[in-house]
């Protein structure tokens, strides 16, 4: 949508929602790894559209490339979901990030379960799973589907209530969800690590 006039988008969505109701959902892809540009766009369209959190995707990409040399405490720095949690569509990979594409930035396989855990089980953002990660790419069955099914089930049953973050170590971070009365037995803890050391008490 970065090549479409932003005022047109704002007026178009106003017109559609006047007919279809204010809950009519819209999301745009503005592929730029610069949160300030995305902030400006959201302001120009009067916050009428959600955006894919491209900066978060690039954090995941860098984390998967650097391994233990990436500071996990910085994963959500300068991301849409950090500043606009209700307008951010969080994702790990998509068709644009695949190998040999013009925007190649594919998250390595080892980090994908960690990244999906972070977007599916946290309270902020609107998580989106890449078709290729759940089903297949080039008719080859995805190895990620079993863990995604577990995470989706955990999201449905347990990812409710207040969230407490423990982003206090460069190689080991985590968070808890306290659960709520509307979802009996809900609540969870997620811990991720990209190195050998680190602990949470």
Q: What function would you assign to each model-found segment?
A:
Residues 2-201:
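Active-site-proximal helices and loops of the catalytic beta/alpha 8
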């Amino acid at each position: 949508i970065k090549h479409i006039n932003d005022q047109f988008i704002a007026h178009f969505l106003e017109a559609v929602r006047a007919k279809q109701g204010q809950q009519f959902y819209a999301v745009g892809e503005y592929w730029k790894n610069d949160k300030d540009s995305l902030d400006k766009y959201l302001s120009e369209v009067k916050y009428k559209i959600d955006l894919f959190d491209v900066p978060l995707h690039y954090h995941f990409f860098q984390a998967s490339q650097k391994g233990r040399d990436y500071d996990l405490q910085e994963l959500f720095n300068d991301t849409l979901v950090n500043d606009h949690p209700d307008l951010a569509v969080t994702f790990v990979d998509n068709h644009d990030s695949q190998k040999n594409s013009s925007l190649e930035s594919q998250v390595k396989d080892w980090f994908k379960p960690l990244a999906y855990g972070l977007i599916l089980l946290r309270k902020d953002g609107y998580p989106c799973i890449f078709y290729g990660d759940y089903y297949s790419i080039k008719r080859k069955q995805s190895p990620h589907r079993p863990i995604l099914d577990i995470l989706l089930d955990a999201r449905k049953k347990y990812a409710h209530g207040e969230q407490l973050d423990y982003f206090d170590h460069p190689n080991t971070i985590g968070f808890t969800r306290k659960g709520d009365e509307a979802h009996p037995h809900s609540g969870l803890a997620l811990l991720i690590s990209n190195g050998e050391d680190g602990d949470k008490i």
